[in-house]
């Protein structure tokens, strides 16, 4: 079987310390990215940090590390619209705003709002829809600020246990909250949520905490216990080890997505709605795997 996997990483200078907190130290995220496009079996892969209709970004600023994932809604393809354009442009805009310092670390919803507003104001309409999940680490306060709209999301793992996670937002089965831009004649007929509808949260993190941010292609195919099993293999806190683990998670999710006999989380969710579904859920998969580390300039 021929498949294509793309992996990337953000090389940040960081020194890993113990698990004890020291207020005088700044923190950073050391992040690796891996993913599959749904059509990866055909050997088709987009350039950059885009996997099928998924997109992601990793950005650094002197005050914070910021990362995000977005999942373009594939249904737009039926109307001749490339779903990846919306998610990719949304993430690139978020990335640019962060690098330009046009954001407040405590307000990731603000980043999403500003980026979405720019898309709305484009002279050439950019049609489409997307979920979005943003994670911001404030270096000095050691607090993680998050915003999640839809069914992408994040996990924070400490000592092998999930200590924080995002809440999935669905209007109804398999219909997540989403940002949308519709043609004028279809406004009001296309499902669209406000960035303010995103579920936001803030909490302290510790050195060595693992943060996994991903699109639903991961969570629909791998339950928490499988993800935690893979994270246990992360023995070394160097970039190569983080990237290898991110790759292993993405590969396993991709394999399970095409297993017709596997009772996936998505299939279990469908059964809760009275649907007779079995097997994995073929989808684009994007995984950002981060470790909280001590920051050195």
UniProtKB/Swiss-Prot annotation:
Alphabetized InterPro entries for the sequence: PPM-type-like_dom_sf, PPM-type_phosphatase-like_dom, PPTC7
Record's subcellular location: Mitochondrion matrix
Source organism, top-level taxon: Eukaryota
BP-aspect Gene Ontology terms: regulation of ubiquinone biosynthetic process
Enzyme nomenclature, EC number: 3.1.3.16
Pfam family, one: SpoIIE
Molecular function per GO: metal ion binding; protein serine/threonine phosphatase activity
Binding site for Mn(2+) 1: 71-72
The UniProt record lists the keyword Hydrolase: yes
Stated family: Belongs to the PP2C family.
PANTHER family linked: PROTEIN PHOSPHATASE 2C, PROTEIN PHOSPHATASE PTC7 HOMOLOG
Entry protein name: Protein phosphatase PTC7 homolog
Originating organism: Xenopus laevis
Taxon lineage: Eukaryota, Metazoa, Chordata, Craniata, Vertebrata
